[in-house]
Regions:
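A short, basic/flexible loop-to-alpha-helix module at the beginning of a structural domain
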Residues: 1-12
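Glycine-rich FAD pyrophosphate-binding loop
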Residues: 33-54
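Short coil/turn connectors at secondary-structure junctions
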Residues: 12-13, 34-37, 55, 166, ...
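Acidic, glycine-rich active-site loops and adjacent beta-strand->loop/helix elements
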Residues: 21, 44-46, 57, 176-178
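N-terminal Rossmann-like FAD-binding beta1-loop-alpha1 element of flavoenzymes
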Residues: 13-40
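Glycine-rich active-site loop/strand segments that organize a redox cofactor
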Residues: 58-90
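Conserved redox-cofactor binding core of oxidoreductases
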Residues: 89-195
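Gly/Ser/Thr-rich helix-start
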Residues: 22-25, 49-50, 57-58, 190
């Protein structure tokens, strides 16, 4: 049984991100860009998680308030407004963020009108953003393990190249076994296993 507490650590990082798909990559980039020393750990031998096999697109708002009303309707009151407001505050910044990330490798961004899935007010105020081309990148060659047929590999390539450019440490083939806590129960680390 792995202990929940330890006397010392093998390595020290400000932030350890577990999982190297889209979410893990963006979390690692955000922590690094905020000044943290980051370790990005992935249990599989190759990065990408299931994200690399996804469509790789992001549905974004043309109109923040209309999209807020749409999301509020789709959640039918189950998500507090302050959570949806915080979500929208970040959602309206994603297009610019992806544009910035895409400069790392000259990725081409494609925007397509794509309304919401349900005919609630505001459903027609959204669009779809994807990476649809990267010079000298062939997803079937470069990510043969992913067997992806859609845009996921393109978005992941942009994220992976940004991770590499920033020199963020990554570990593949290591799994998180247990969180390590201090004597007050606060998380102080993570037990990673490469076996």
């Amino acid at each position: 049984m792995l202990s929940r507490t330890v006397d010392s650590f093998d390595e020290m990082f400000d932030v350890v991100v577990v999982g190297y798909g889209f979410g893990g990559a963006v979390s690692a980039l955000s922590a690094h860009d905020a000044g943290a020393e980051v370790l990005l750990a992935e249990k599989m031998p190759n990065p990408g998680g299931i994200s690399i096999c996804s469509g790789g697109g992001l549905r974004l708002p043309h109109d923040r308030d209309a999209t807020f009303q749409y999301l509020k309707a789709t959640n039918d009151g189950t998500t507090p407004d302050n959570i949806l407001e915080a979500f929208m505050d970040e959602m309206v910044q994603i297009d610019e963020y992806v544009q910035e990330l895409a400069t790392v490798n000259g990725a081409r961004i494609k925007r397509t009108e794509r309304p919401g899935s349900y005919a609630f007010p505001g459903f027609d105020q959204m669009y779809f953003l994807q990476i649809d081309d990267i010079p000298d990148f062939d997803p079937k060659r470069d990510y043969a393990y992913a067997n992806a047929l859609s845009g996921g590999p393109f978005m992941f390539k942009v994220l992976q190249d940004n991770i590499a450019k920033r020199g963020i440490k990554t570990r593949l083939g290591v799994s998180a076994k247990r969180l390590i806590t201090d004597d007050k129960g606060a998380v102080a680390g993570v037990w990673l296993d490469d076996g």
